[in-house]
Amino acid sequence: MDADAVAKAFVEHYYRTFDTNRPALVSLYQDGSMLTFEGQQFLGAAAIAGKLGSLPFAQCHHDINTVDCQPSGPQGGMLVFVSGSLRTGPDEHPLKFSQMFQLLPAGGNFYVQNDMFRLNYG
């Protein structure tokens, strides 16, 4: 599978899981993984799961507009940049967001080493 196909499959899996079973996202991170969420940093799978689980909405739906990827590093990793919009309820206005993942290979799969998320206002 080429890098673009891996990136698109990861993005589809990540946001489907976020929208339907957010606690299951913890399996995509490791102890050395880092999330920067709106400028706040969280280190390790447990801290990341805690942050994602504490978000102040029960429902969420992501619509993805773009997925771009590049190879990253000699170990076969990749950078994945995502832009799109999300809704936190059926009557809520969509919010634009950008998110970047650095994926690293581990045991025939990939895990999220770095994750940066920002809402885009304006």
UniProtKB/Swiss-Prot annotation:
GO terms for cellular component: cytoplasm; nuclear pore central transport channel. It is found in: Cytoplasm. InterPro entries: NTF2, NTF2-like_dom_sf, NTF2_dom, Nuclear_transport_factor_2_euk. Keywords: Cytoplasm, Protein transport, Transport. SUPFAM superfamilies: NTF2-like. Residues 6-119 form the NTF2 domain. The keyword Protein transport applies. Pfam families: NTF2. GO terms for biological process: nucleocytoplasmic transport; protein transport. The keyword Cytoplasm applies. Facilitates protein transport into the nucleus. Could be part of a multicomponent system of cytosolic factors that assemble at the pore complex during nuclear import. PANTHER family: NUCLEAR TRANSPORT FACTOR 2. This is Nuclear transport factor 2. It comes from Oryza sativa subsp. japonica. The lineage of its organism: Eukaryota, Viridiplantae, Streptophyta, Embryophyta, Tracheophyta.
